[in-house]
């Protein structure tokens, strides 16, 4: 990925998904990669980090507009009622994110 922090947090995200995926729904959303680099680069990233979570493509930028994405990465925690619980702009701290996931 052209996004260094995205690649940096990818292994921790994989780990958290493996540990919390049965209780918390994880969705990775690719905002620019498919448009600028092609779907092959997105697939390559997912395979490199062995992600098993769904990866959605925001080709029209609708999701990034909805959640006011202005930098990458961004992590959005949404509770079971669809309410945004917490937003992390930039690379997340794995320990902090794990504590927040445990509370959802």
Locations of regions flagged by a protein language model:
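Thiol/disulfide oxidoreductase modules built on the thioredoxin-like
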Residues: 47-52, 59-102
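The canonical Cys-X-X-Cys-His
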Residues: 3-6, 75
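Short, conserved active-site loop motifs that form the nucleotide-linked donor/cofactor pocket
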Residues: 24, 53-54
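Conserved short-loop catalytic and cofactor-binding motifs
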Residues: 1, 30-33, 85
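Structural microenvironment flanking redox-active thiols in thiol-disulfide oxidoreductases
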Residues: 7-48, 59-65
């Amino acid at each position: 990925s052209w996004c260094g922090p995205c690649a940096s947090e990818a292994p921790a995200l994989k780990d958290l998904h493996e540990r919390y995926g049965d209780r918390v729904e994880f969705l990775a959303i690719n905002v620019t990669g498919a448009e600028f680099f092609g779907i092959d680069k997105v697939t390559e990233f997912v395979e490199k980090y062995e992600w098993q979570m769904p990866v959605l493509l925001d080709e029209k930028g609708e999701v990034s507009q909805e959640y006011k994405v202005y930098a990458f990465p961004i992590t959005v925690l949404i509770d079971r009622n669809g309410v945004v619980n917490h937003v992390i702009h930039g690379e997340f701290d794995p320990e902090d994110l794990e504590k927040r996931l445990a509370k959802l």
